Amino acid sequence: METKIKKAILDIVKGRIDRANYGMCSKYFVCTSSLDICESNNIHITKKLEYKDTITINGVVIGEIRYRYAEHKRNGMYKMLAPIISYID
């Protein structure tokens, strides 16, 4: 898989995580080029944000995203950390 696609997926996931952590006060903006790359290649990411999501191209699973959470509460909640993205080649 191309590195452009991998970077676009990571950018979108980081934006979702920042939005989940900080809500309306999040300062991370997803690049429109990342959204365009995913749309032009028919890449879809499920939107559960619980434990794991899947990445699909035309209905075929190409990878999964496993989310990690902080061990201790910060500001009354467990923050989401950087995800682990594994691709099936």
Residue ranges and their predicted role:
Residues K4, A8-I12, R16, S33, ...:
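Charge-rich, solvent-exposed alpha-helical interaction surfaces
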Residues R19-I85:
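Acidic, low-complexity, intrinsically disordered interaction modules
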